Regions:
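A metal-dependent hydrolase signature that marks the N-terminal structural subdomain at the beginning
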Residues: 2-133, 160
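Post-HExxH zinc-binding segment in Zn-dependent metallohydrolases
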Residues: 121-128, 238-263
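Short pre-active-site segment immediately N-terminal to the catalytic Zn-binding motif
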Residues: 209-226
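Active-site recognition of the HExxH zinc-binding catalytic motif
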Residues: 225-238
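Long, intrinsically disordered low-complexity tandem-repeat segments
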Residues: 150-168, 174-196
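A structural signal for the main folded, soluble domain(s) of proteins
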Residues: 194-201, 231, 256-257
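Active-site-adjacent "gating/activation" loops or surface patches in catalytic cores
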Residues: 124, 128-142, 196-211
Length: 263
C-alpha cells in the first residue's frame, strides 16, 4: 500500500486517498461481537429514531419548515465503520482540493497518507453520528474520491465522540472507492446512498451499540439522543444556508495553515 507519485497542485494531491482508506480499514475492528439479530435491530432502531427526531427537533427549536426541508433533502445513512471512513475521506479530499499546496515529493506524500489513514481509522471508532453539509458552490471541485458520488463535498460538523473501543461488528463495507454501506451487508440490512441534494447525516451503528453496552444505557434512550443531536445540526444547516460555506471556509484556513507549517 505504497502511495504512487503524482503531480501536486492542491492539498488533496498530497494524499493517496485509496491507500489512506485501506490503511484505516486495516487497523480498525469492525465493532462489538454480537448476534446478527442484534446488529439488524440496532440499524432499525437508529433509522426509526432519526425519522422521529427531525420533526421533534423542529418543534423544539421553533423551526418546523427547516425540519421538513431537511427531511426532504438530506441523505440519512446508518453506516458501519468502513462506511464512515469512506464518507469522511470523500469530504476531506474535496475540502483539501480547495487549498493550494507545493509538491513535497513521494516521501512527504507517503507520510501524509499514513497520517490521514490513522486519523480516519481513529475517528471511525469514536463518532456516534456526524452531519456533513454540502460545500459552498464557490468552492473549487476536484476529482471525486468516488466516481458515484455527487459533486460537492462536506466538512464534518456536529460530531459526537465517545471514547469507544470495540471488537468485530458490521461488515467492513465495500471497496475503498464505493459509497458507504448502510447497515450490514452480511445480514441483509444493506442499501446504497440515495441521490438527495442536501446534507448527509451519518449514524454509526457499531459505535452506538458499543457505547450503549459499555455504559449500560437504555436500549431506546441513546439512539434517540444521538438522532436528536444530529437532527438539530441538520435543521441548523437548513435554517441558515450560509453556515455550510462559512464552516468550509474556516476549515480551509486550518488546512492551509497545516500545509504551510509542514513545508
Amino acid at each position: 500500500m505504497r502511495p504512487s507519485p503524482v503531480p501536486v497542485s492542491t492539498a488533496a494531491d498530497l494524499i493517496d486517498w485509496d491507500v489512506a482508506v485501506r490503511l484505516a480499514r486495516a487497523v480498525v475492528p469492525a465493532g462489538p461481537r454480537v448476534p446478527a439479530a442484534t446488529r439488524r435491530a440496532t440499524v432499525a432502531l437508529l433509522r426509526r429514531s432519526i425519522a422521529g427526531a427531525l420533526p421533534w427537533a423542529g418543534r423544539i427549536a421553533g423551526l418546523p419548515d427547516a425540519a421538513r426541508s431537511a427531511s426532504a433533502t438530506a441523505e440519512i445513512l446508518v453506516v458501519d465503520r468502513a462506511g464512515l471512513i469512506t464518507a469522511s475521506a470523500a469530504w476531506l479530499r474535496e475540502l483539501m482540493d480547495g487549498c493550494a499546496a507545493p509538491d513535497g515529493g513521494l516521501g512527504a506524500r507517503t507520510l501524509a497518507t499514513a497520517q490521514v489513514g490513522a486519523v480516519l481509522g481513529w475517528l471511525s471508532t469514536r463518532l456516534l453520528g456526524q452531519v456533513l453539509p454540502r460545500l459552498d458552490a464557490r468552492a473549487p471541485a476536484g476529482a471525486p474520491f468516488d466516481a458515484a458520488a455527487r459533486p460537492g463535498a462536506r466538512p464534518a460538523v456536529g460530531d459526537i465522540r465517545p471514547d469507544a473501543r470495540a471488537g468485530a461488528f458490521l461488515s467492513r463495507g465495500s471497496r475503498p472507492g464505493a459509497r458507504p454501506a448502510v447497515g450490514d451487508s452480511r445480514t441483509g440490512v444493506h442499501a446504497e446512498a440515495d441521490s438527495r441534494t442536501g446534507a448527509r447525516l451519518l449514524l454509526v451503528a457499531p459505535n452506538v451499540l458499543e457505547i450503549r453496552q459499555r455504559l449500560d444505557l437504555d436500549v431506546l434512550d441513546l439512539p434517540a439522543w444521538v438522532a436528536l443531536h444530529e437532527a438539530t445540526h441538520l435543521i441548523q444547516l437548513n435554517a441558515a444556508p450560509w453556515l455550510a460555506g462559512h464552516l468550509a471556509d474556516q476549515l480551509r484556513v486550518v488546512v492551509g495553515g497545516l500545509v504551510a507549517a509542514s513545508r
